[in-house]
Swiss-Prot record:
<feature type="binding site">
    <location>
        <begin position="165"/>
        <end position="167"/>
    </location>
    <ligand>
        <name>NADP(+)</name>
    </ligand>
</feature>
<comment type="pathway">
    <text>One-carbon metabolism; tetrahydrofolate interconversion.</text>
</comment>
<dbReference type="GO" id="GO:0004488">
    <property type="term" value="F:methylenetetrahydrofolate dehydrogenase (NADP+) activity"/>
</dbReference>
<keyword id="KW-0658">Purine biosynthesis</keyword>
<protein>
    <recommendedName>
        <fullName>Bifunctional protein FolD</fullName>
        <ecNumber>1.5.1.5</ecNumber>
        <ecNumber>3.5.4.9</ecNumber>
    </recommendedName>
</protein>
<comment type="function">
    <text>Catalyzes the oxidation of 5,10-methylenetetrahydrofolate to 5,10-methenyltetrahydrofolate and then the hydrolysis of 5,10-methenyltetrahydrofolate to 10-formyltetrahydrofolate.</text>
</comment>
<dbReference type="InterPro" id="IPR036291">
    <property type="entry name" value="NAD(P)-bd_dom_sf"/>
</dbReference>
<comment type="subunit">
    <text>Homodimer.</text>
</comment>
<keyword id="KW-0521">NADP</keyword>
<dbReference type="InterPro" id="IPR020630">
    <property type="entry name" value="THF_DH/CycHdrlase_cat_dom"/>
</dbReference>
<keyword id="KW-0368">Histidine biosynthesis</keyword>
<keyword id="KW-0554">One-carbon metabolism</keyword>
<dbReference type="Pfam" id="PF00763">
    <property type="entry name" value="THF_DHG_CYH"/>
</dbReference>
<dbReference type="GO" id="GO:0004477">
    <property type="term" value="F:methenyltetrahydrofolate cyclohydrolase activity"/>
</dbReference>
<feature type="binding site">
    <location>
        <position position="190"/>
    </location>
    <ligand>
        <name>NADP(+)</name>
    </ligand>
</feature>
<keyword id="KW-0560">Oxidoreductase</keyword>
<dbReference type="GO" id="GO:0035999">
    <property type="term" value="P:tetrahydrofolate interconversion"/>
</dbReference>
């Protein structure tokens, strides 16, 4: 029988630990605080911002939102970032992506203080991952995949893992993280030939394509562990992943649902990183 790997159970366990840690920080008169930088007024960004603020409020994490014009000059953005980097009460900084085209992505990412880079956007923090150092900040989404597997006692050692994504947000950092856990990893992408023949041989398949229900049962074997990272909207306006969940769920060993899967853990790990930063900087 297929095991459903619910992320909300993992998130709840992490939050229970965070509550205890936040209480200890309060005893030192330290309140974890996140600065959010949003450029423009995209509905998706605003919805995500509200979700983060709500999650922070539940754990008594403070937030400071900087609503910026989409045409903000890079010079002005960097001045604001410098100010936030120097503000002692701010423990974490989150900049919403993608950036407006006139801003240099590497310049923006490099402007975030390393000790406040809670979503691991700074090139030096990413470099640490590729050197095998997972003790600092790591990107929240790849970490969520790892945390779910650990929670359900799925050992990565010796496993063959296929990741269908080659971005610096998910695929590349996740590949380094599973390598550090002694797995063997294959990265696939849109130009990969005969993808099902590759994924079907894997022990674990991680998909982050961004195409609703694209991945069907022929991509898996009966023991496949399926980690669906994407959050898409189907033809009926309902949230779904890359995997055709209803048709696949009884034909694999284990699978994460969408929603209540990887996404719920991703947001919780962002909160954890804020608390981590507050503890390190206290």
């Amino acid at each position: 029988m297929t095991k459903i790997l619910y992320g909300n159970e993992v998130a709840l366990k992490i939050k229970e630990d965070l509550n205890l840690r936040i209480d200890k920080l309060k005893e030192k008169n330290i309140i974890p605080k996140l600065a959010i930088l949003r450029m423009g007024n995209k509905p998706d960004d605003i919805a995500y911002e509200r979700s983060i603020i709500k999650s922070c409020e539940k754990l008594n994490i403070e937030t400071k939102v900087e609503e910026l014009n989409e045409d903000i000059l890079e010079e002005d953005f960097l001045k604001l970032m410098e100010s936030l980097n120097n503000e002692k009460e701010i423990h974490g900084i989150l900049v919403f992506r993608p950036y407006p085209k006139h801003l240099n992505e590497n310049t923006i990412n490099s402007s975030i203080a390393l000790n406040k880079d809670v979503d691991c956007m700074h090139p030096l923090n990413l470099e640490r991952i590729f050197e095998g150092d997972l003790n600092q900040f790591v990107p929240c989404t790849p970490e969520a995949v790892i945390e779910i597997l650990k929670y359900y006692d799925i050992d990565l050692k010796g496993k063959n893992i296929v990741i269908i994504n080659r971005s610096m947000v998910v695929g590349k950092p996740l590949s380094m993280m599973v390598l550090s856990n002694n797995a063997t990893v294959t990265i696939c992408h849109s130009k990969t030939i005969d993808l099902p023949s590759i994924t079907k041989k894997a022990d674990i398949v991680v998909t982050a394509i961004g195409k609703a229900k694209l991945i069907k049962e022929e991509y898996f074997n009966e023991d496949s562990i399926v980690m669906d990272v994407s959050i898409n909207v189907d033809e009926n306006g309902k949230l779904c992943g890359d995997v055709d969940f209803e048709n696949v769920k009884e034909k694999v060993g284990a699978i994460t649902p969408v929603p209540k899967g990887v996404g719920s853990v991703t947001t919780t790990l962002l909160l954890k990183h804020i608390v981590d930063a507050a503890e390190r900087n206290s």
